[in-house]
Amino acid sequence: MTQMTDAKSGITTEEMKFVAKEEGMDVETLKNLIAKGYVVIPKNVNRNTKPVGIGDNLRTKVNVNLGTSPDFIDIACELKKVEISNKYGADAIMDLSTGGNLPEIRKEIIKNTNLPIGTVPIYEVGVDAKEKYGRVIDMDEDLIFNVIERQAKEGVDFMTLHCGITKQTVSALNNDPRKMGVVSRGGAFLTAYIMYHDKENPLYKEFDYLLELLKEHDVTLSLGDGMRPGCLQDNTDRAQIQELITLGELVDKCREKGVQVMVEGPGHVPYNNIEANMKIQKTLCKNAPFYVLGPIVTDLAPGYDHITAAIGGTLAAVSGANFLCYVTPAEHVRLMKEDDVKEGLIASKIAAQAADVAKGHPVAWKLEKEMADARIKHDWERQFEIALDSNKPRKMREEIPSKDEKACSVCGDYCALLMVEELGKR
């Protein structure tokens, strides 16, 4: 049984009750959205995961990527990133490790959080294939599905799998060349496999078998966008849309089998094209939850891509995206450090909150009202408690204090609020 099959059967699970309470939503309404495939609750049956709802009519959720690379392997560092994710309100974590003992790293990450955990299994497949055969492109079907099954048994809650990379998608790419080609790592692995062996993508060819594996453990399938644009010039091209058409067809198959599914999206997109991208996805994929990376709205800000992504993420979420993958200041430059994780997470949560306010979500507006109440009362401690990051504003206030404990050092004696209050007392 999965959350989706239960919902279709009219069964109300404990996870549904929890999510409905968190969202301020009637559980029957939520159950109907899950049954239709408009909402997912990524929760592997083998793991005690905190239930998190992702999809239409819910708050916008934020994911944190972390993990090792061949150039930097430090489990302790990754666990600090997990700790930061827990502390600053991430809704999910993805382990994208490609260096070191991948199963051991994943085990430690899972042990140190109750947030939903996602992976990209093709990364481990590529690492294993290189160790076993000497080249990533020599991976085979058995290796691919063995890794997926092993991760499902370990408790991974959702998996990014690039099932839409097909011979037809690769043909669209070749017929309409890009500035930057394929920038998705998993997408590149499978594109290279197809081109070198002239074989179909096993994840597409054996999609029904894949669904059997995922359904057994109620792993949510996150259909990866292997043809996402890697620069603004490549946005919304034929390869991207061809893959999206295929993903829409695969969404139908998932729903028929009762497998929870969401769809991933771009990427690098000019601000004026973001809304159109969201509408196209929601139409082609029939309102499946949409999970976007950014989108980044300019390529000129390495070192500041948490900002470019937050700008794009706000509009994306207002226009239909349900799940934002954070982007850190280190994007396009190096592996993220702990401080990068915090900066990226807070920036993405700002985008999510701004979008939820624009969409009129009651939970988002409740928080805004509480902040306004705290400010009018000059209740600084309450303001810090409500803030997305309590530590930074508290520290900043201590650095340059005001003589008046109700005011801040910007205005001091000339505080507008205090001045009007004083007049009101007369």
Swiss-Prot record:
It catalyses: 5-amino-1-(5-phospho-beta-D-ribosyl)imidazole + S-adenosyl-L-methionine = 4-amino-2-methyl-5-(phosphooxymethyl)pyrimidine + CO + 5'-deoxyadenosine + formate + L-methionine + 3 H(+). This is Phosphomethylpyrimidine synthase. Keywords: 4Fe-4S, Iron, Iron-sulfur, Lyase, Metal-binding, S-adenosyl-L-methionine, Thiamine biosynthesis, Zinc. The lineage of its organism: Archaea, Methanobacteriati, Methanobacteriota, Methanomada group, Methanococci. [4Fe-4S] cluster binds at residues 408, 411, 415. Gene3D superfamilies: Radical SAM ThiC family, central domain. GO terms for biological process: thiamine biosynthetic process; thiamine diphosphate biosynthetic process. Belongs to the ThiC family. Its cofactor is [4Fe-4S] cluster. NCBIfam families: PRK13352.1 (NF009895), thiC (TIGR00190). GO terms for molecular function: 4 iron, 4 sulfur cluster binding; carbon-carbon lyase activity; zinc ion binding. Pathway: Cofactor biosynthesis; thiamine diphosphate biosynthesis. Binds 1 [4Fe-4S] cluster per subunit. The cluster is coordinated with 3 cysteines and an exchangeable S-adenosyl-L-methionine. Zn(2+) binds at residues 268, 332. Its EC number is 4.1.99.17. It is an enzyme of class 4 (lyase). Catalyzes the synthesis of the hydroxymethylpyrimidine phosphate (HMP-P) moiety of thiamine from aminoimidazole ribotide (AIR) in a radical S-adenosyl-L-methionine (SAM)-dependent reaction. Substrate binds at residues 65, 94, 123, 162, 184-186, 225-228, 264, 291. InterPro entries: ThiC, ThiC/Bza_core_dom, ThiC/BzaA/B.
